[in-house]
């Protein structure tokens, strides 16, 4: 004779990374968000000016609340607005001159191929994962003499930007500032150098533009303290007890989460049952989307003591996170056997 039992118990398991996002604001700092721009029409007539950036960028992270480390920094819909600039030079006894104004400057900041990857132990990332494109702004002015007599009226647009990327390494730092209910709070700072090298035509003269500086943005971030709590937030039932069973079906909230199900899902198709192909064997059919946490299969001949089930295949026991499809438990020779699923609550 065989019997089945599916439970979820509130023990302890290591914490995994949790997705979170926030809006970062470019900081007002004399050493950051100052982009030095150089224009060079040739003939030794280069000039430089500095634009100060303000703006925001949405940032996505994958945070381990146990240590405040992230494996991801993805930047989306960033907008950095720059102050106006003027470039003017006269040389060769007034035989060559220009006066150029750049106004209403703005740059888009985005991750090129999300997700942006961060080394979690150091917070360092390759800055060239992120774009910095000047895609708004007007260039007006004149050139004369040896570099041509031209009126300048050009625009940066998304179709005609001055394109650049991050350069070298950037850093992202998360500093825990305390807990608020089910959330862990962080202050966040992301810093990365940027560089642009582009050209535009003024008449027949090619004017080179280079820009270099370091972008720094900061903000605050809230992350659920555990991946189970993150699931409760996503299910619109924040902080419901891990061992709670609101519908009385014998399957706890924690087991629903670990199975990769929604709070209102029917768990019965995914619980242990006799394996019709193997007498006295068991079968655990897992959801196609994969499990969300390790699940330990335990067995007992009499319910008094439990031990990890042996001969589990095709995966190890505990069942690893992300497992889908059928997991089988071979017979152990007992005339009577109970099987249960044990899930441990993250710290």
Predicted regions and their residues:
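Low-complexity, intrinsically disordered Gly/Pro/Thr-rich segments
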Residues: 189-202, 323-328
């Amino acid at each position: 004779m065989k019997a089945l039992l599916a439970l979820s118990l509130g023990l302890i398991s290591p914490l995994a990374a949790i997705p979170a996002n926030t809006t970062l604001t470019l900081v007002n700092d004399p050493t950051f968000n100052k982009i030095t721009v150089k224009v060079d029409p040739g003939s030794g007539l280069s000039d430089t000016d500095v634009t100060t950036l303000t703006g925001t960028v949405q940032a996505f992270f994958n945070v381990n609340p146990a240590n405040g480390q992230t494996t991801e920094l993805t930047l989306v819909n960033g907008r950095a607005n720059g102050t106006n600039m003027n470039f003017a030079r006269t040389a060769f006894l007034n035989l060559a001159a220009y006066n150029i104004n750049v106004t209403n400057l703005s740059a888009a900041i985005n991750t090129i191929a999300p997700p942006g990857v961060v080394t979690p132990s150091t917070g360092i990332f390759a800055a060239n994962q992120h774009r910095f494109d000047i895609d708004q702004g007007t260039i007006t002015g004149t050139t004369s003499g040896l570099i041509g007599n031209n009126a300048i009226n050009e625009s940066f647009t998304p179709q005609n930007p001055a394109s650049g990327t991050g350069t070298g390494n950037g850093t992202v730092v998360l500093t825990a500032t305390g807990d608020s209910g089910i959330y862990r709070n962080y202050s966040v700072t992301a810093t990365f150098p940027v560089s642009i090298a582009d050209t535009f035509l003024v008449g027949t003269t090619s004017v080179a533009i280079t820009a270099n500086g370091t972008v720094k943005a900061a903000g605050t971030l809230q992350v659920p303290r555990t991946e189970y709590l993150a699931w409760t937030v996503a299910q619109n039932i924040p902080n419901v007890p891990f061992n709670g069973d609101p519908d009385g079906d014998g399957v706890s909230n924690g087991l629903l989460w670990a199975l990769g199900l929604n709070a209102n899902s029917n768990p019965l198709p995914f619980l242990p049952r006799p394996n019709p192909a193997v007498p006295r064997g068991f079968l655990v059919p897992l959801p196609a989307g994969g499990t969300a946490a390790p699940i330990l299969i335990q067995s007992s001949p009499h319910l008094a003591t439990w031990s990890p089930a042996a001969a589990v295949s095709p995966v190890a026991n505990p069942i690893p996170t992300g497992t889908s499809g059928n997991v089988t438990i071979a017979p152990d020779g007992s005339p009577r056997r109970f099987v249960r699923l044990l899930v441990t609550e993250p710290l």
